[in-house]
Amino acid sequence: MARTDNDTWDLASSVGATATMVAAARAVATRAPRPVIDDPFAAPLVQAVGVDFFTRLATGELTTEELDTNDAESPVGMSRFADAMAARTRFFDDFFAEAMRAGPPPIRQGVILASGLDARAYRLSWPQDMVLFEIDQPEVLTFKAATLADLGVRPSTKLATVAVDLRNDWPAALAEAGFDASAPTAWIAEGLLGYLPPDAQDRLLDTIGELSAPGSRLAVESVPTHHEADQEELREKMKESSDRWRSHGFDVDFSELVFLGERADVTDYLRDRGWTVDATPTNQLLTRYGLAPLDSDEGFAEVVYVSATR
């Protein structure tokens, strides 16, 4: 189903299903012979969502080799998708670790925008006086907290969940949860911008800037602009990937979930607004973590990972 202005979702449908798919990819990456990441909560969270395709992928019952058979024409196979998600996850893990070592003044509050099934509040080590804010739709946050509690898992830091849609007044909800705009903050927007219209991307970055005291840091995954002439071809490629996995029970059409079109280059946008910016292309990130680079025409090859300091 195509996106609408006020659409909602759970972790088994629409944009929420992509969060579950990414968690399944993290489970695949965690089982790798030489894992780049270690996310012990990815598989149980996916299993709790209860979508058969994702469950079988997360537990290893369905292998990436099975999904990638005869998949040479696909924009990206499942094994490369898992590699890309492993590198992406590690980038944001490393960002938080580096941010916690920054200062003075030290950064002791972090914000995860559209956190989905992100379990960093549970699986990473944090300073004793750290507070982490997770923002997402109420149903997503409630499900994740309840599932991890049932597993007997407790957060490794002070965790404040902020149940609000990013299309609503999330800064007010964040402040009500205890966020201190006068203190430096580490922000991450992982796997988010492609699901925002271009103008909403700009508003989000502007709002983050307004809430960021000196010394704050931001990490974001920047998606490329897509000119009108290229949009139909890209949507068709995304649909082909979805269709190839459909015989295994996959029921998500990526082409209906993302917003294409021309959008601001995040690196330039932040730099023009006073941030000091560093940009890392996907293939450079893959190489850094010992993973094979993507071909130029594979999905995610054009994504750039941006870290910025206020």
Swiss-Prot record:
Organism of derivation: Mycolicibacterium vanbaalenii (strain DSM 7251 / JCM 13017 / BCRC 16820 / KCTC 9966 / NRRL B-24157 / PYR-1) (Mycobacterium vanbaalenii)
EC number from the UniProt entry: 2.1.1.-
Superkingdom to which the source organism belongs: Bacteria
The name this protein goes by in its record: Putative S-adenosyl-L-methionine-dependent methyltransferase Mvan_1346
Binding residues for S-adenosyl-L-methionine: 136, 165-166
InterPro entries: Ppm1/Ppm2/Tcmp, SAM-dependent_MTases_sf, SAM_mthyl_Trfase_ML2640-like
UniProt KW keywords: Methyltransferase, S-adenosyl-L-methionine, Transferase
GO BP: methylation
Family membership: Belongs to the UPF0677 family.
Keyword Membrane: no
GO molecular function: methyltransferase activity
Function: Exhibits S-adenosyl-L-methionine-dependent methyltransferase activity.
